[in-house]
């Protein structure tokens, strides 16, 4: 942008004709209209530069743009400069360990170098010929995820869960594991959520070592925030800023990238606000008529290419728990897997509190994961489902009233439930237990041994918060002795 400002003769200058909240109308000379999605610079009275993005062109040499920050102090007649490019954000190693806003400006009081690479936030999705077509499992090292609802490399995962069930810790563990096991990096896009949550996440990341304060380039994550106090334009575009940073790591550095979007519903909500401000006719339930297109433009860029992959984990808020609401319904069409966090499991102290029966994945097919993995997962689910059905009888009559066969099912299900828990690396600080990464082969082996009855002699408490099955057996022997 600064380059454009230095070339005086080519400056394309217009003037504000109207300001309505975050919406600005500006008039330019005939034949000099900025393109759609171009960034416009406006200087406010106090000297701050406000960036707006062109949304509509009118036939009287007028454009309508949406501001990325507050428009306080703007008035008619103020100069508007067309930067002749979309919003450009910094990319690459310099972004690691840092916090950015929608415009790629740092908000952590540490300056970023001027020579950094920058890319526009509006880019085409990878072409069909560049896509990686063979489905591959993205191993996370988290037993419950890898066994029952495996993630697809370059796929999209919906993360469902209320407050206080462990979303943040699960997100941080995934960031940690992708860095260690895949040599990858992560980008976190905070879209329209609470500023306090963004601050807490940053502090927890520093505490757990995900962000290395003494050497920022050794950090494993870049953070981009457009929180709920921001104008709708910023909340609508912050997801694209985070995605652009992730694309650079995938396409140029050829890395596997994890992209977190918290919350994808707020992206839709911001788009709905902008749509209303621009005077578009609302669609079902008051959402924008372009809902499907906007969601598709974001989701289609999240994919595996021959260079690397972007695997996206998106927190999904379901308004009024209505899954048929157009916002979550449109999101579901793009998801490959869902990870549902259960308050009931969290109350039992089973972490990660991933619900083994509600979480799903399109990858759990014998052709993709192999018959051993598939059969083990189905048998685990069947055992847990039977245990769930028997819980009412146990609560009323007690376990002694069950048949011998059902008692065996309950015993194995309790072992499975506890074995699905796991100590996390990022939780070491407050649990005191060292974290464990369990590869898929050991995960399948462990659950098979429980299902086959090889471990019936051991107490179920030995399976709680352990890594692989050998650790559980060693713990069980210690308890017995």
Curated annotation (Swiss-Prot):
Which reaction(s) are listed as its catalytic activity?
ATP + H2O + 4 H(+)(in) = ADP + phosphate + 5 H(+)(out)
| Lineage, broadest ranks | Eukaryota, Sar, Stramenopiles, Ochrophyta, PX clade
Q: Which family does it belong to?
A: Belongs to the ATPase alpha/beta chains family.
**SUPFAM superfamilies, from UniProt?**
C-terminal domain of alpha and beta subunits of F1 ATP synthase, N-terminal domain of alpha and beta subunits of F1 ATP synthase, P-loop containing nucleoside triphosphate hydrolases
Q: Name one GO molecular function term.
A: ATP hydrolysis activity
* EC numbers: 7.1.2.2
Q: Which Pfam families did the record assign?
A: ATP-synt_ab (PF00006), ATP-synt_ab_N (PF02874), ATP-synt_VA_C (PF22919)
Q: Which UniProt keywords apply?
A: ATP synthesis, ATP-binding, CF(1), Chloroplast, Hydrogen ion transport, Ion transport, Membrane, Nucleotide-binding, Plastid, Thylakoid, Translocase, Transport
* Any one GO BP annotation for this protein: proton motive force-driven mitochondrial ATP synthesis
Per its UniProt record, what InterPro entries does this chain match?
Answer: AAA+_ATPase, ATP-synt_VA_C, ATP_synth_F1_bsu, ATPase_a/bsu_AS, ATPase_alpha/beta_chains, ATPase_F1/V1/A1_a/bsu_N, ATPase_F1/V1/A1_a/bsu_N_sf, ATPase_F1/V1/A1_a/bsu_nucl-bd
Q: What subcellular locations does the record give? A: Plastid, Chloroplast thylakoid membrane
HAMAP family registered for this protein in UniProt: ATP_synth_beta_bact
Subunit details? F-type ATPases have 2 components, CF(1) - the catalytic core - and CF(0) - the membrane proton channel. CF(1) has five subunits: alpha(3), beta(3), gamma(1), delta(1), epsilon(1). CF(0) has four main subunits: a(1), b(1), b'(1) and c(9-12).
The name of this protein is ATP synthase subunit beta, chloroplastic
Gene Ontology cellular component terms for the protein in this record: chloroplast thylakoid membrane; mitochondrion; proton-transporting ATP synthase complex
The UniProt annotation places ATP binding at 161-168
Q: How does it sit in the membrane?
A: Peripheral membrane protein
**Role this protein plays:** Produces ATP from ADP in the presence of a proton gradient across the membrane. The catalytic sites are hosted primarily by the beta subunits.
Gene3D superfamilies of this UniProt entry?
2.40.10.170, Bovine Mitochondrial F1-atpase, Atp Synthase Beta Chain, Chain D, domain 3 (1.10.1140.10), P-loop containing nucleotide triphosphate hydrolases (3.40.50.300)
